[in-house]
Amino acid sequence: METTTGRARYAFVSFLMLNDSYLPGALMVGYALRKQGTHADRVCLVTEDISTVARNALRRVFDYTVEVDTVYVPHKRRQERQDRPYMFTRMNVLRLGADGDLGFAYEKIVVLDADVLPFKHYDHLFTLSAPAGILNEHKSHFIEIDAEGQYVVPQDVEMTGTWKWHRLYDSVCPHGHRIPKTITDRVSTDPLNLGINGGLFVLEPSICEYRAIMEDVRRPETLEMVGDLFDWPEMQYLTLRWSGQWTNVDVRFAGLNGYPMLSVLYGTHFGGLKPWQFKREKAIRRWGRYPDFQVWFAEYTEMVSEVHPDLRKVRRLQRLLDDIHELNRHLGDEGLL
């Protein structure tokens, strides 16, 4: 994974943008990748809003912490999600290549959101043709749910490691294969179609592509899509922009909410409630007992208590550790653990 000059050819890239609230998640991405023994660099992009305390914490688990500009693309339904106009800030990852202006020369990067927890096999992602990502047309393709809204886990999943997503796509575009353009083009006629999941991308950085995207999203016809029709602007936009070029990534690399079971996953994606959002007390008491949250809690406790105890000097991180201990005591008393 190195060039002849000894510099890494590849990098995992995550983000901390706008404020420090996702700091625990970003730290866990870097820590989990380090535990896998990856030889790729670990890079965290931050915006100017991120505190010095948070940046210093990130340097404990990332090789590089790089400040980038915030990209603002107006969205008519910002009131539903305050971060919607800033989602294209993630496109700064395209500046990390040899032609970029951030001082790096990566040939390929794996882009991970801070709410993804990698488990294993993530270096394999660098072998895939870029762009690559997990086909995520609808949540119902990821998770099977019964009439009462409860998860339905296929009886043979522990043996096969596959479920509904694989039944839908394995015959057409299995892991590592090109996704037909007819599939990714569906986003253009169905705004509810999420396209390629933005929580995990495999990309080849190109500042020319970055500049082209920045120019394109200012065009009125593009702005109508990314500034109104799309709930996930940059994700659905990229699905269409690179339609016909995408390589499919197995959903096991970022199974949604620990579904169907952690033992068959290579990573999990915390959609909705995040394991560090203890201000949502009722929700965290409900979901905190489930295996995906418990694994995140255990890994976080290991990171701040054993491997990087200096992180406990950060008030936010110590408070989270205390909250985790208190929640687990409560769950234990209730017989839920």
Cite the ranges covered by each PLM segment:
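Active-site-proximal specificity loops/subdomain of glycosyltransferases
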Residues: T52-A105
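Conserved donor-nucleotide/metal-binding helix-loop-beta segment in metal-dependent transferases, i.e.
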Residues: P118-M159
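Short internal beta-strands
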Residues: R42-D49
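A glycosyltransferase accessory/donor-loop signature
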Residues: E2-L16, Y22, M28, R60, ...
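Catalytic metal- and UDP-sugar-binding loop of GT-A-like glycosyltransferases, i.e.
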Residues: L112
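Charged, glycine/proline-rich intrinsically disordered loops and linkers
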Residues: R81, F142-S188
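Short aromatic/hydrophobic "clamp" motif used to bind/position activated sugar donors
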Residues: I109
